[in-house]
């Protein structure tokens, strides 16, 4: 516990809040160009081939960003919209690409949680396609 005189001399140090997505420069999203599109493996104990893109943002910073959903149409020089949000089992991936905007297509055949994957609403007359792996053998 400091004395009053010590506080007068030095004062309390203010804690600075650190951003979890510093490359966005306090913006909700940023536009960018894909520099490299590749797959990588997650940390233990998970196993998969996660789709990731290296993106150069409009503020000339480069970030690794995750491509959510099944399948994508991204390649080098694709224009994408990047938002914050890390992927827990991929070290160094602190951003997500927004599906269904700019050059990024929405996830095809998606019927639930469509807004998160940029999928359009299916036509009312069409029967829902059977879900993968749920059919009878």
UniProtKB/Swiss-Prot annotation:
What Gene3D superfamilies is this protein classified in? Nucleic acid-binding proteins
Family recorded in the similarity comment? Belongs to the universal ribosomal protein uS12 family.
Per its UniProt record, what NCBIfam families does this chain match?
rpsL_bact
**Signal peptide span per the entry?**
none
Report the GO molecular function annotations. Answer: rRNA binding; structural constituent of ribosome; tRNA binding
Please name one Pfam family that this protein belongs to.
Answer: Ribosom_S12_S23
CDD domains under this entry?
Ribosomal_S12
Give the 3-methylthioaspartic acid positions (modified residues).
89
Report keywords, A-Z: Methylation, Ribonucleoprotein, Ribosomal protein, RNA-binding, rRNA-binding, tRNA-binding
Q: Subunit structure, briefly?
A: Part of the 30S ribosomal subunit. Contacts proteins S8 and S17. May interact with IF1 in the 30S initiation complex.
Region Disordered: what ranges? 105-137
* Protein's name in the database: Small ribosomal subunit protein uS12
Q: Name one GO biological process term.
A: translation
Q: Which GO terms describe its cellular component?
A: small ribosomal subunit
Q: What does this protein do?
A: With S4 and S5 plays an important role in translational accuracy.
Compositionally biased region (Low complexity): 124-137
